Structures are given as C-alpha cells and as structure tokens.
Amino acid sequence: MCAAPKQGNTLIEVGNQTVIQGQVWHDGAPVAGAYVRLLDATDEFTAEVVTSPEGEFRFFAAPGEWKVRSLAPVGRGETTLSAGVGIHETTVKID
C-alpha cells in the first residue's frame, strides 16, 4: 500500500530566515484570493502565492530589496521594502 505519512504541525526556526508577510487590503477590508508576487530589486519575478481568506500572505526570501505586488479582480497594488534576517510585516493596499 502506498500512502503519504501522517502530517502534523511543523515548526520552522525563523531566527536565521528572511520572512516577508502581511495582508492585502481594499476599501478597509482584507482581500481573499488575491495573487501576491515577490519581485527582486531588478523587478525579476521570484515567487507567487494566493492570499488566505483573511488576505494574508507569506514568503521566505533572501535578505535584500523586495517589491510585493498584488493582483486581484478589484485592482492591483504594490509596496517595496528592505528586508534583512527576521520577520517583516507589510501591507499591500489596492486602490
């Protein structure tokens, strides 16, 4: 019989990681199902995730300059940040 092993909660040590996380907002409410892209300092696409029902997203990245861009049916938005080791919170507002 072939089956995946039972899954459980996994803890990740973020003390030596660069984590970029946050929420996507539009008109004062979180945006669920928005595509969020992580672009490097040269605007090169690096990763993409879909926001949770609460509009949340998370990326594990290298330290550096980053652009976070959101694309949703209600519009698009972006923000830039400089991220070192640690957890970096950001908000992407869609106009």
Question: Predicted segments — roles?
Answer:
Residues 63-74:
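A short, solvent-exposed beta-strand micro-motif common in secreted/extracellular proteins
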Residues 55-59, 88-90:
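Short strand-edge motifs at loop-to-beta-strand transitions and within beta-strands
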Residues 1-19:
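Beta-strand-rich domain onsets/edges
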Residues 60-64, 84:
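Hydrophobic loop/turn residues within beta-sheet-rich immunoglobulin-like superfamily modules
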Residues 3, 73-95:
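Structured interaction patches on ligand/partner-binding surfaces of diverse proteins
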Residues 42-56:
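Short, acidic Ser/Thr/Gly-rich low-complexity loop/linker segments typical of extracellular
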Residues 20, 26-42:
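Short, ordered, surface-exposed loop/turn motifs in non-cytosolic proteins
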